[in-house]
Amino acid sequence: MTRHGKNSTAASVYTYHERRRDAKASGYGTLHARLGADSIKEFHCCSLTLQPCRNPVISPTGYIFDREAILENILAQKKAYAKKLKEYEKQVAEESAAAKIAEGQAETFTKRTQFSAIESTPSRTGAVATPRPEVGSLKRQGGVMSTEIAAKVKAHGEEGVMSNMKGDKSTSLPSFWIPELNPTAVATKLEKPSSKVLCPVSGKPIKLKELLEVKFTPMPGTETAAHRKFLCPVTRDELTNTTRCAYLKKSKSVVKYDVVEKLIKGDGIDPINGEPMSEDDIIELQRGGTGYSATNETKAKLIRPQLELQ
């Protein structure tokens, strides 16, 4: 009875299971995956490494990074920009050189045409030039002119049509045997790269001086634990992935957002060091992940080329 498993793909219908299996192996089709809790970072972890930060910093959009990881990312972006800029400058130099060559060839062709016109001008007065055949006529040199054939061609369709194709393709004649007449792929032109450094998560421009140091308040007894816990320095409540938190620029601390709404917005003073604050001195932290679809986006999608079956 083990032979039934060997013939699982012998059906005449391309099943859904076979399509999914072939899509994973062939590199075609969009892939979907359900992310678990281990694939989603916590609120105090780095957004790049998904690991606890040794030297945490925060971006203007509220994402937490490890200083070492974000510096390596910024350096990699600058190296990629320098590489793309060299390729773009090389393309511009090649285009300018090709334009100069084409201009020189056009000038040479113009001079040759003018010289040929001067040489073909009759020097004797009364000389008669040989008449040239009309363009598009069906007159054979040295033969008999047939006006009936030309009338039939005009009656059947447009002049200059080389095939039964319509539109612009009707006047073109591609040939498999002649390389010059075969359609070729045109090389895509490179656009000038942008020198802006972007945040790897939000995609917005970011500067190194905009990254601010973060001081989390650890919960007593968890300083040396594998999974450290942190609390709000004002309310002394535990901060979790579902807690709405805010970063205070004056004291570099992370507090619950209830502190901002109930204390800071009314008094305009940092409750930790007593310095005056404004709304620009408050950054809302991006929340961490819980692994539940009701709270976070737990589905990942990878878009790849689609496999078309005839």
UniProtKB/Swiss-Prot annotation:
Its main location: cytoplasm. Residues 115-124 have a biased composition (Polar residues). GO terms for molecular function: ubiquitin protein ligase activity. Residues 115-141 are annotated as: Disordered. The keyword Nucleus applies. It is found in: Cytoplasm; Nucleus. It comes from the Eukaryota. Keywords: Cytoplasm, Nucleus. It holds the Pfam family zf-NOSIP. One of its GO terms (cellular component) is cytoplasm. Negatively regulates nitric oxide production by inducing nitric oxide synthase translocation to actin cytoskeleton and inhibiting its enzymatic activity. PANTHER family: ENOS INTERACTING PROTEIN, NITRIC OXIDE SYNTHASE-INTERACTING PROTEIN. This is Nitric oxide synthase-interacting protein homolog.
